Amino acid sequence: MAVELKETIDKRREEIMDACEKLYETKGFHSITIKDISVETSFSRPSIYNYFQTKEEIFLGLLTREYRKWNIAIAGIIGSNKKLSKDGLAKELAKSMQERKTLLKISAMNLYEIEENSRDELLVEYKRVFKESVEIFDECLKKFLEDTSKSRRQQIRYAFFPYMYGIYPYSYPTEKQISAMDEVKLSHMDVTIYDLTYQFLKLIFGL
């Protein structure tokens, strides 16, 4: 009975997060309300509060889910390849990042506010999954960059994870930002999540 109840709760939380993610594709964080999310789901606004106390907690749950998916993707790289060249590894990691647009967007745009307005236990769960990301990323480096020392792997991690926060804004500048850059004749180019990830990894891998 308890298992069935947990499965029901998890399913409903997933539906709420799915609705939030759908809205986030076309609306900004501050424009999305619990009411908007309820319209996209089968739940009333009061019902949503049975699963999340704040809008920020929904976004934190969504971000946690995104990191879990990324962890699975990196584990897939480790499990399905015996060997990879540095370039091959850069390409595989770039592919995994390309699929995590929502992860990059939340991290770049709204992470601080989301963390501040979520319950401690949910924040701890997010940090636990994030820690797994760091560990599995290091495991990936250790397997495929065999001649790389532990300290060098740490340097790569400390370069790449902060870099991730800048990927989304460069890949998806707003119309207002583009207009302002054009006004001051600041050059800019169309780049993808894949391109930015791949080129940076090549750089820190020494290619």
Give the location of each predicted region.
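N-terminal intrinsically disordered/low-complexity leader segments
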Residues: M1-K11
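Generic hydrophobic, amphipathic alpha-helix propensity
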Residues: I9-C20, I37, L62-E66, W70
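C-terminal peripheral helix-coil segments that are non-catalytic and often amphipathic
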Residues: E135, E139, K143, D147, ...
